């Protein structure tokens, strides 16, 4: 067997390893949570809906349908582009992950790279085209961001680190305050939830202030940069130790 073939086998074995749950994996999910906060600050200000917070979008959809705020909340943005794309992204990545192995390194890298590419594409649309609400460019932008968000949440949930959802904060807030061991010094679950919430909220603040100081294109690129870091970081995660026979 040639040395080049052996090297290829080693690389393939490395890429098909199942990665383990550790501090690095948790840190990657926390960084994705930060990116989510940044992204939703941009999507709300430009599109009048969220790319990730579908609970909020459900409320906006009802308000818009009842005409409580006139045409402030668009069915095309909230219902078709954001909620629909979010579900489509979650379904696609969730089901493919079930088939190929949700912890496979190659799957995590490829899926994360795809999600990141969608965010960069949304930034390109934002930079090059006008995006009045209801325009094709606006619908395309929110579709890309929401599809990427749904895929990200599905990827994160499939890793079974339920304390870090990368997007939804409501349950995490209650999990923290209702934890019977909330005041214990050593409480890994509480710590993960608190860090997740802090990073998600911090991302929202960063996105909001960056929107005020620069523009939404910059915010979306910043989100994409965070996701790029995570994509490459997946290459460094340690594998689950295989049992020796």
Predicted regions and their residues:
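Alpha-helical transmembrane segments and their membrane-interface boundaries
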Residues: 2-167, 188-204, 208-244
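Cytosolic, membrane-interface loops and tails of multi-pass inner-membrane proteins
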Residues: 165-182
